[in-house]
């Protein structure tokens, strides 16, 4: 029922990531972005995973479960993590006592229509696809 901040450092035997292309307005849907994302499979990569574990009840505010990103020490490899193997790692975990959500105050944000059904489907597909 808690949020956790996570940091994992070491040499990853294997790490699989993905990264979307840069997009301009009008922004495509998350499902459209997934069609053109790049998939990366790295081996023996030294670097750091950072991310969060969010409780399932926060789905919609965040992504329930683990949401992790990777960057190699030399800054040439990275992306959203969906799989990794590591033998020796330093793992750091923090349990924040507070959660603050700050919403944009722009006119554009005020006017946007968010379809929750579509949003939940897109997030589920994005987090479960490779």
Task: Name each region found by the language model.
Residues 22-24, 67, 85-86:
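Short, solvent-exposed amphipathic alpha-helical segments in soluble enzyme
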Residues 47, 56, 76-77, 88, ...:
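Mature extracellular or lumenal effector domains of secreted proteins
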């Amino acid at each position: 029922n808690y949020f956790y901040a996570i940091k994992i450092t070491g040499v990853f035997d294997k790490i699989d990531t993905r990264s979307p292309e840069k997009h301009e307005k009008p922004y495509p849907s998350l499902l459209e972005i997934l069609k053109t994302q790049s998939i990366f499979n790295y081996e023996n990569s030294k670097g750091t995973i950072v991310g969060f574990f969010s409780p399932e009840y926060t789905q919609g505010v965040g992504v329930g479960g683990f949401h992790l990103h990777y960057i190699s020490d030399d800054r040439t490899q990275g992306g959203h993590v969906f799989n990794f193997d590591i033998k020796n790692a330093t793992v750091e975990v923090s349990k924040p006592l507070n959660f603050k959500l700050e919403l944009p105050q722009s006119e554009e944000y005020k006017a946007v229509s968010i379809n929750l059904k579509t949003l939940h489907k897109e997030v589920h597909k994005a987090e479960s696809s490779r």
